[in-house]
Amino acid sequence: MLDENEDIHPLFAGAPATTEFKKLRKRIVRYTREAIEQYGMVERRADGSTPKWLVCLSGGKDSYTLLAVLYELKWRGLLPVDLLACNLDQGQPGFPSTVLPEFLDRMGVPNRIEYQDTYSVVVDKVPQGRTYCALCSRLRRGNLYRIAREEGCSAVVLGHHRDDILETFFMNLFHGGRLATMPPKLVNEEGDLFVFRPLAHVAEADCEKFARAMNYPIIPCDLCGSQDGLQRQQVKQILDGWEKNRPGRRQVMFRALMNARPSHLLDPKLFDFQGLELGSREKGENFGEIPLLR
């Protein structure tokens, strides 16, 4: 196994030698490895073949962090999969189409760059004044699934982090009337591809610090002009306020997503309330009591 302080891939060329950055890098790698192991993302195939992942790269801080940490794990022998980086150029006005191909080629990262003008479709279909995000995301997802199949990949790997998952939970809670979020691992509707989110335990702030320290060529995410007033931005502001008033609240809330008690919720599809009887094992602490936040 390679020494943990060794720069093992061109993606880490010029990495800061500061103690602070080394701690940051080690923390991101540890959390990513934990998520991969905890949620069983690496397939153990009976025929001994190596799984192949399509790593989706948008040019934002999160996807650069994802790509770098996956390559670090792979080069350390801790991630026995083949990686193919993929960028889908959706025809957004002003998108710098040469940035990612040049970066990936310079880094020696196998990649597929594909142009699909979904932007024009979205502009044509979405009424004026509405945000493009939902339809744009659906079209992007369909194209990524197609590319994964064409490339023989068993999984599409996305750069969503802890804060994305928390925000999605509260969006579902506030606007969808359900307790749900982005899972770290799922199977697509067709049943032929996994979708993985290895950065599920990594904080957005860490991704931002990492990508900035590495000086990756960040592409802005607001090229379509459809970002203002989004529900996600509103939820982010709420969470920012909670975190400011009570530092550490984000992590507490995130831990709650891994500590669900169906018997202490209200969904009869998740727990057999009808069959609950005196003397049953499902008893104990009253989770209806609100704990004092310290």
From Swiss-Prot:
Its cofactor is Mg(2+); [4Fe-4S] cluster. SUPFAM superfamilies: Adenine nucleotide alpha hydrolases-like. It catalyses: cytidine(32) in tRNA + S-sulfanyl-L-cysteinyl-[cysteine desulfurase] + AH2 + ATP = 2-thiocytidine(32) in tRNA + L-cysteinyl-[cysteine desulfurase] + A + AMP + diphosphate + H(+). GO terms for biological process: tRNA thio-modification. Keywords: 4Fe-4S, ATP-binding, Cytoplasm, Iron, Iron-sulfur, Magnesium, Metal-binding, Nucleotide-binding, RNA-binding, Transferase, tRNA processing, tRNA-binding. The keyword Oxidoreductase does not apply. It holds the Pfam family ATP_bind_3. A motif (PP-loop motif) lies at residues 58-63. The keyword ATP-binding applies. GO terms for cellular component: cytoplasm. [4Fe-4S] cluster binds at residues 133, 136, 224. Binds 1 [4Fe-4S] cluster per subunit. The cluster is chelated by three Cys residues, the fourth Fe has a free coordination site that may bind a sulfur atom transferred from the persulfide of IscS. HAMAP family: TtcA (MF_01850). Homodimer. NCBIfam families: PRK10696.1. Catalyzes the ATP-dependent 2-thiolation of cytidine in position 32 of tRNA, to form 2-thiocytidine (s(2)C32). The sulfur atoms are provided by the cysteine/cysteine desulfurase (IscS) system. The thiolation reaction likely consists of two steps: a first activation step by ATP to form an adenylated intermediate of the target base of tRNA, and a second nucleophilic substitution step of the sulfur (S) atom supplied by the hydrosulfide attached to the Fe-S cluster. This is tRNA-cytidine(32) 2-sulfurtransferase. It comes from Ruegeria pomeroyi (strain ATCC 700808 / DSM 15171 / DSS-3). The gene is ttcA.
